[in-house]
Amino acid sequence: MSLLKVFEAFSGYGSQSIALERLGIEHKVVGISEIDKNAIKAYYALHSEDIPNFGDISKINPEDLPEFDLFTYSFPCTDISLSGKVEGIVRGQTRSGLLYECEKIIEHCKPKYLLMENVKNLMGKKFRPQFQEWMNYLKSLGYNSQCFVLDAKDFGVPQSRTRVFLVSVLNEECYLTLKTKELDTFIYDIVDENDESRNFIKEIPELKGAYMNGAYRGRKKDGKYVQTLEFRGDYCSNTITTVQKDNVVVLDGKVGYLTPKECFKLMGLRDEEIEKIAKVVPKSAQYKLAGNSIVVDVLVEIFRPLFLESGQK
């Protein structure tokens, strides 16, 4: 295919363009929309500094945007996620309501391809009607859409992370067959037992010599919420979030948090990419960057049939 021009809204550090690079797809990012200062630093550490950032999406005039073929919009999950305030997708009022700011861009620029990503709760009882309305809106513009609910661990990544993806194609049928991959890399392949930067929080002598992973969860006990250590048995991490407590490992009887490097690896980044981010973003902010991003390996398997395989050109 010819050069693919891309606009990444709510870009983070640019997982979508990283996935395109992994596939060797000739592309050019013609613009991004991002307001988080650390995400912007990370983006330009990984990508060309010549890519213009149009800033706050609510203030973008679509007439100022260049032409592009692919529009990605992983809008904020703050008001949808069960771990957030769940205040809903409210136009002009909530962070998740920024979804509707994408309308002006889609209507004016009419990109051939759209890719949306958000948390699983978007398909829940509360938000499903709004999600259906959004798909109906896209249909009215001529877009045919295909929805996927995908877990990163089904794509060879040892992280239990389920997300909703919506692929839309203008004036053409959209029918993609995604290839999954069995896990051959596990959490203990990711964790560096010798990393001295790890923050340990407690010691459990009876687990000395054991390797386990899990999370601290708030559980009610005697009328009070207490932090309880819960373990997983499938050698996958819990969903990488913006906070540390959701992922811990037990190394030789000591309970410690995953490091930012390990979190980024579980999001599909390579060592050299992680090092570039670490040079410009403080450690405390790296957890948020990883937690807000998209697993590269999943994006690769969406883009592969969309842009490389027969049936979708």
Predicted features and spans:
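Conserved active-site and SAM-binding loop architecture
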Residues: 1-313
